[in-house]
């Protein structure tokens, strides 16, 4: 058989194989996975105690980037949380904004029920209208009970339906020691949470950058009242720590006689972002003192090391039946590891790439995982995604590649 016939037969066989596997992309990663060195140390496990106690019924501190627990004291005890409830209320509203279901500029008419709320409020009257953003600002800064009910009714049709969604969202977030009965935390039976659960929803809310404007604004004004009876209402942030504690940038205070003085506080210094929660303190000064003590401990003992920035490349992938043939597996998000100050133990990252993907591949599609280890212990796993689109290679392209491989 001459060379020409051999090539024709070989090409025909190749075509049959290519047809059989059309549409499936085989990822051929490099032989050696990329490992990235950084520094780390063991941090207190969830059941471990910090070397001091605070005067609170429940307390916790977490790394806001990873959720790693750095301090806890009765962190899972079910306790009343007063206006700290409003973290979940704000979360559902801002998620509705991000999902395009409502807009910050939408006008909300205040119902009689919303206007009748007692406690901290903006003293709005039934029938007046305010934007979603104005109401959110009032809730974040002045802890407005009337604003909570108005927003709940606008988003869900009624406060009751909105509360059902609050409990569903809590379940989705893994908040196992939480049950909501209303949107604002006014005293009612069977309404409770834990310091740990509050930290979880605080982390989630803080992901929404718009809310940070309201958390860190000390004073503002808004106009309230029916047409012809308008008046200026002053908003003063209930969280004094935003002016008293270095790096404090949120989040929410709370107080009722039953709950005591409560606070979920966020603070950032350089790359380290911590969230500390206290429940059931005896005075507002004690609440601020204990939160400050916890945060001081965190910043004194830990620092954040950036393992990868969003878009960092961990593998160059050969997509066998794709065009283009190459795509990078990159970090889908910024990845950090909290480490003890002064320690130099290594954190190692290892990329694992999926063996096959369905084509076409869209930029941002997950194609692997990045595992982060502290010694032998896995401390996190993060998605690796494609940094570009990969379409199915045409039959002609595949045949051309085959012949290129022969010569």
Named regions from a protein language model:
Residues 1-2, 175-176, 187-192, 196-407:
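Domain-terminus/edge residues, biased toward the C-terminal soluble/receptor-binding domains
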Residues 1-35, 403-407:
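Gram-positive cell-envelope targeting signals
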Residues 18, 45-47, 262:
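A generic local structural motif
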Residues 25-196, 200-209:
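Active-site-adjacent loops and short helices of periplasmic peptidoglycan-processing enzymes
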């Amino acid at each position: 058989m001459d060379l020409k016939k051999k090539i024709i037969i070989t090409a025909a066989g190749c075509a049959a194989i290519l047809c059989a596997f059309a549409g499936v992309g085989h990822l051929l990663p490099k032989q050696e996975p990329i490992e990235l060195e950084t520094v780390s140390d063991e941090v207190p496990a969830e059941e471990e105690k910090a070397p001091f106690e605070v005067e609170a019924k429940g307390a916790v501190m977490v790394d806001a980037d990873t959720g790693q627990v750095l301090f806890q004291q009765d962190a899972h005890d079910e306790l009343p949380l007063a206006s700290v409830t409003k973290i979940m209320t704000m979360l559902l509203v801002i998620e509705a904004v991000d999902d395009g279901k409502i807009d910050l500029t939408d006008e909300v008419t205040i119902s009689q029920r919303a206007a009748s709320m007692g406690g901290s409020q903006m003293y709005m009257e039934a029938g007046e209208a305010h934007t979603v953003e104005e109401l959110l600002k009032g809730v974040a800064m002045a802890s407005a009970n009337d604003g909570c009910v108005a927003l709940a009714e606008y988003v869900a049709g009624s406060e009751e339906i909105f509360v059902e969604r609050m409990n569903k969202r809590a379940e989705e977030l893994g908040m196992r020691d939480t049950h909501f009965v209303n949107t604002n935390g006014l005293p009612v039976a069977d309404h409770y949470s834990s310091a740990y659960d509050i930290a979880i929803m605080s982390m989630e809310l803080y992901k929404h950058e718009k809310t940070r404007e309201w958390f860190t604004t000390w004073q503002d004004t808004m106009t309230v009242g029916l047409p012809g009876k308008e008046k200026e209402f002053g908003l003063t942030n209930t969280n004094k720590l935003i002016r008293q504690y270095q790096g404090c940038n949120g989040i929410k205070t709370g107080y009722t006689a039953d709950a005591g003085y409560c606070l979920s506080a966020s603070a950032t210094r350089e790359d380290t972002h911590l969230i500390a929660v206290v429940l059931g303190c005896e005075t507002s000064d004690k609440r601020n003192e204990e939160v400050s003590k916890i945060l001081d401990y965190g910043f004194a003992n830990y620092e954040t090391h950036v393992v990868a920035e969003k878009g960092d490349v961990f593998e160059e992938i050969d997509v066998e039946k794709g065009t283009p043939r190459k795509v990078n597996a990159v970090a889908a998000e910024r990845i950090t590891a909290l480490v003890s100050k002064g320690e130099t133990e290594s954190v190692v990252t290892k990329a694992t790439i999926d063996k096959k993907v369905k084509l076409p591949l869209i930029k941002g599609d997950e194609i692997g995982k990045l595992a982060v280890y502290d010694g032998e212990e896995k401390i996190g796993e993060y998605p690796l995604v494609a940094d570009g689109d990969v379409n199915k290679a045409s039959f002609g392209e595949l045949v051309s590649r085959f012949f290129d491989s022969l010569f």
